[in-house]
A protein has these predicted regions:
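N-terminal pre-triad scaffold of radical SAM enzymes
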Residues: 52-88, 127-130, 136-140
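A short small-residue
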Residues: 85-91, 137-140, 239-244, 282-284
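Auxiliary Fe-S-binding modules of radical SAM enzymes
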Residues: 1-63, 104, 115, 250-330
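Terminal low-complexity, intrinsically disordered regions
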Residues: 23-25, 36, 73-76, 86, ...
């Protein structure tokens, strides 16, 4: 498959299933049969496309459209080792560093490819429902933690410039992060570039206690560091929280753990933090560990309701594929 040639520049940014929020319909469900066709597309988030090494398109359930992923960790290095992660870190991966010029060229070409509609003529995206045939964002995520990239601020600024050159100011720039590195100066500069270019931070928070955090994330980074970083970031701008809950060895998170999760959200708000949305979701692709399974749609809905009632924060549900058949979750 060939991508369009790079255009002259003018002088002028981490699961599948269908979303629901408070029982209300969303665009992905509004088209009946079309909403059913979207499921296979949502479940395959390949991080390669054509001959690209760093930039890849996905149909994102949380974005309600096409998201252009920017993979800053092609070597699969991550400072978390989450039990539910879809990235296979057991295989020896090729050591590849980010080639800035190659990334710039790929993003430039992919923006043209999506905005022209050519992407929807490919076999991978030809079944995309009409309502989702739109570029929603450029997302910095990929096979590891993007903020560990040493030139993080530079890459954010450069991608913002490319987005502006394509007059794609309506497209967001989304950082999907575990928030572990937000305290570093060059990362804070990158977050400020996001603020100036229709940016949004989606930070992971999936535990209420240190014990559960260590069980799920498997990292030496202290839970308190993550909480402090999220609090500081949320004081500076409203952020989105991503919270994935699952069954571990057949057991969903306890009521006590979920209550502690709500307490952490309330503590962040009490310290001046602002939330746009809490995304509550579950496992939708093959996890790292076989003892990890999705919770049911009902269980996801109950967590959404708990967040709304206990915290007064908007929350949205994203379900696992086939999870309606699950039972026994609280």
């Amino acid at each position: 498959m060939s991508l369009p040639p790079r255009q002259p520049q003018s002088a002028e940014p981490a699961s599948a299933g269908l979303p629901n929020s408070g029982g209300e319909s969303l665009p992905a469900r509004a088209e009946g049969e079309a909403s059913l066709r979207v499921v296979p597309l949502h479940t395959h988030h390949e991080r390669t496309f054509a001959e690209n090494r760093f930039v890849y398109p996905v149909l994102s359930r949380r974005s309600h459209g096409i998201s252009l992923g920017v993979n800053l960790n092609p070597d699969k290095v991550c400072n978390f080792d989450c039990i539910y992660c879809q990235v296979d870190r057991t295989r020896q991966s090729e050591t590849r560093f980010v080639d800035m010029q190659a990334l710039v060229d790929e993003l430039d070409s992919m923006l043209s490819f999506v905005r022209s509609g050519q992407i929807f003529k490919t076999s991978e995206f030809q079944e995309t429902p009409t309502a989702l045939r739109r570029l929603n964002d450029i997302a910095f995520s990929g096979d590891g933690e993007p903020t560990t990239y040493r030139n993080f601020d530079e890459i954010i600024a450069t991608c913002a410039d490319i987005k502006a050159q394509h007059h794609a100011n309506d497209a967001k720039m989304v950082l999907i992060s575990n928030a572990s590195m937000f305290h570093r100066p060059h990362v804070q500069r990158g977050l400020e570039y996001l603020d100036r270019n229709n940016g949004e931070i989606w930070a992971k928070l999936e535990a209420g206690t240190e014990e559960y955090y260590k069980l799920v994330e498997r990292t030496p980074i202290p839970f308190r560091q993550v909480l402090d970083n999220i609090t500081d970031a949320a004081r500076r701008r409203p952020i989105v929280i991503q919270a994935l809950f699952m069954r571990i060895h057949g057991k969903p998170p306890s009521e006590q753990e979920l209550a502690a999760f709500a307490d952490r959200l309330n503590e962040i708000r009490a310290a001046g933090g602002q939330f746009k949305l809490i995304q509550v979701y579950t496992v939708a692709r093959q996890p790292a560990e076989s003892f990890v399974e999705a919770i049911s749609d009902c269980a996801v809905d109950e967590i959404v309701e708990m967040v709304q009632v206990r915290c007064g924060i908007p929350a949205q549900a994203f379900y696992g594929v086939g999870s309606d058949d699950l039972s026994g979750d609280v």
